[in-house]
Amino acid sequence: FLRKHPERITFYAPIVTFLMTLMAGTGHTAFSTLPVIAEVAKGQGVRPSRPLSIAVVASQIAITASPISAAVVAFAAMLHPFGVDYLTLLAICIPTTFIACMIGAFVANFMGCELKDDPEYQERLEKGLIKLNTEAKREILPTAKKATFIFLGAIAFVVCYAAAISGSVGLIENPALGRNEAIMTVMLAAAAAIVMSCKIDAGKIPAAATFRSGMTACVCVLGVAWLGSTFVNAHVDGIKEVAGALLADYPWMLALVLFFASMLLYSQGATTVALMPAALAIGVAPLTAVASFAAVSALFVLPTYPTLLAAVEMDDTGSTRIGKYVFNHPFFVPGVVTIASAVALGFAFGGLLI
């Protein structure tokens, strides 16, 4: 789909990652699409940071609209005593977050200079550090279709499994594999099936640009993300205490509190469970809580989240880079615009349904 419509990659990329997260209940499904997004954008002459940034943001905010995500299931249970049911929550969150992603994509489409005018890109191009894949050079192997079907089948299985083990569906109780572990296991099994059934020379895999980018991203995820979460986990109680005290004095600041808390807690579910009960207990209106729910998706602010780091590493043009001031990275503005739009739309839609 992305390869067939390269000219609109900045808008189609977040649609794909949003829908995948919506169905699977986890943003880690975006890992499989990031290399394709980067390659298609580069081939079209589009600055890869534009579609990559909003695609990552879409994969994060879609958690607050996914029927099977832990954050939505937990929040729905909290809202039930206040007369807001599960379906009403979804009826508000799904359209508002999707429209917000499209607004964010529109903003991202104007971020940064054109790729051909980027000095970093030109420097890397001169040094031969960028691999350009043109249509003339692309050779489609006869087994490509089979490999694609295996890959799509694996994604479909992951989505179904995530739904089956979720609290809202509950077909599988006490699953042996959690959602994230299942994604890794199934996708590795799919990779093995592709290698064996399509008779791929395994020795050539480490030389592939996508494999090198992916492994580099793995190292970044293991190191930087682990380090960041270690620091934050040591101060979780303090974060909750400060946020709770702020909400008690200023209930209207719920969206801001959730934004900054999720930035540190690295989890939509953890932020929801930590702060939403306190917010509802001190008298925050259900409409305000539902409208502010999207703000628990500010995982892009600190550039240490796995999908964000993967996007940076998979863009060999250098357009998706983290600035020396930490916060000046291409994910920040589209992310803030998307969350702000989702909250504003949440009040509009929520006012009609609650």
Where are these regions (language model features)?
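Hydrophobic transmembrane alpha-helices that form the pore/transport pathway of multi-pass ion
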Residues: 8, 12-84, 268-298, 350-352
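Hydrophobic alpha-helical transmembrane segments
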Residues: 2-5, 33-49, 91-97, 154-168, ...
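Helix-loop-helix junctions within the multi-pass membrane cores of secondary transporters/permeases
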Residues: 13, 17, 36-43, 48-49, ...
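Membrane-embedded translocation segments of transport machinery
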Residues: 178-252, 256-271, 277-282, 292-296, ...
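Juxtamembrane and boundary regions of transmembrane helices in multi-pass small-molecule transporters
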Residues: 84-139, 298-354
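Hydrophobic transmembrane alpha-helices of multi-pass small-molecule transporters
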Residues: 119-232, 333-341, 347-348, 352-354
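Transmembrane helix-loop junctions in multipass membrane proteins, especially transporters and channels
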Residues: 25-29, 75, 81, 105-121, ...
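Alpha-helical transmembrane segments in multi-pass membrane proteins
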Residues: 9-17, 21, 58, 92, ...
